[in-house]
Each structure stands twice: as C-alpha cells, then as structure tokens.
Amino acid sequence: VTSEGGATVQIRGYLDHLAVEKGASAHTLAAYRRDLEKYHRYLAASGVDDLTSVTEAHVEEFRTRLATADPDEGRKALAPSSIARTMAAVRGLHRFATRDGVTALDAAAAVTPPRPPRRLPKALPVDRMIAVIEAAGATETDTDPARLRDRAMLELLYASGARAAELVGLDVDDLDGLDHPDGGAVILRGKGGKERIVPVGRPACEAVGAYLVRARPALATRGGPALFLNARGGRVTRQTLWNVVSVAARRAGVQQDVSPHSFRHSFATHLLDGGADIRVVQELLGHSSVTTTQVYTLVTVDTLREVWAECHPRAR
C-alpha cells in the first residue's frame, strides 16, 4: 500500500490486529497483505480512499473484476479458490472496521465469495507412502547429513500429520521421548499459535534420532533451536520441504502429484481406515471444527464404494 490515506491506515490496522491478536502466521499475513493491496488499488482507482466511503456496490464490483479477464489491463481472471481467498481478506477487513467503530455499516457483509469446487484430499496408499519415505534415502549406516535430514523430515511428516509450516517450525525442544520403546511425541504449533501434542511411532523416532546424532551437529554452524537445518545452518524452509517430497516421490515412481499436504491427507485417511474415531483425528490434525475433518470420511467412503462396486456380485 503506497499512499497514506484513510484506507491505508485502516488496512495496516487490520493486518496488525491479525498479527498481534489473532496470531496469524507470516505466510497468512503476506497473503492478506497482497490481497488487500489489490483491493486498495481498486478503491483508489474508484476515487475511494476511506473505508467509510465504501458501499456494497464497490465490493460487488471488485469481486466481479477478480473473476473477469481484461487484456487491456493485463488482468487475468482468477480461479474461484483465489477469489474466495481474496474476498475473505476483504470481508475480514470490513468486519474489523465495523467492530472497531471505523465504519457504521459492514459494506462486505452481504457479498458472498464464490464457492470453490469441493476437491477431496488425495491420499497415497500405504505402500506408496512408505515407498516415498524410503526413497529419501538414509540407511542405518548413512552419514550424509542431507539424506538423514530428509528421511527424518518425511518420517515425521507422515507420523504426525503436520502441516508443512508446522514441521519446518519445529525446534529440538519440541521433541519428547524419542528413546521410549512405544514411541515419542512432538509439540506442533498450528494456526493461531495453538499447540497440540501428537504421538509419533518408532520409525519416525529412530529417523529423527539418527538425524540428531549423525547429521544435525554437522549442519548446526550457527547454533539456534531449529530442528531441521539447511546446509548453511539455518532453519529449512517450506520450499525445501516441498522439493524433498517432490524428489522422493519421483524416485519412488509415484505418478500423481505429491506435496507435503499429501502426507497430511494420507495420515488422516489411514487413521480413519484403521478405525480411528473422527474426534481423535480432529485433535491430531489440529482442526478447530470436526466439520473440517469430515472431508476425510468422504474419501474413505469413496474407497469403500469402489471396493464394493468391484467385488460385490450384485454391484452390476
């Protein structure tokens, strides 16, 4: 946001609110800032520089522009999911301004974002998931720091169902009981700074333990608390994790797209397939509402339906 008009100050106040009071991550703040800068440019072009002057018609027109391409302006139409994300930022801004007494009415309250098509999460079968993890390398006698780290990251990603940001944000002190015969636990910090404790099994504990003993000391040139380190001694990034997952999937010969979130989807789906209660899975995933977790039950029902259609004599 370039100018210092009323809208600029109000947007900055909202972003500060998200950071300080809501505990939004740096990634979320960056996305909201980009979306609101786009909204601010539209308002400025419309001659509006204060949220008190914004009408429902302004917000409606902005939503329409997001969905409409304009070659003269070099503007491409956004996908429904991108429009929904942008409008979430706009609606949040106006809701905040109303609650804070900046505006008397919420101009965006009645402007609903498009419903993106429901995409079911894609889980890997258990054997393929194990193949991807093993493709990261690292044998019992391996001394290569990168391979030991990559194997530990993938083992822990699948064992805990962590989000990518949660995994790369782990510190050494977030681990507990790696030497316990029944497995250990990890403290994950999710959205809004909420903490949860997730148990992890022996394969992950052993892989992380091997990394801590045989690899991390060689990488820890800067000191610091981060669990997973890059070659320069800094905390690994989400992009590094994405690359590790992508390379391991290719090595394992998996054709479908595999991302760190595929590990989370597989974690949840395999638990439910194994008979886990959905409320337990909700807690392990860190979902605030069980409704979010229920999408995984649709995946397992689809699997059951496919097996039934394939095997039942009266299915055809």
Model-derived regions: residue spans:
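Conserved catalytic core of the tyrosine transesterase superfamily
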Residues: 1-316
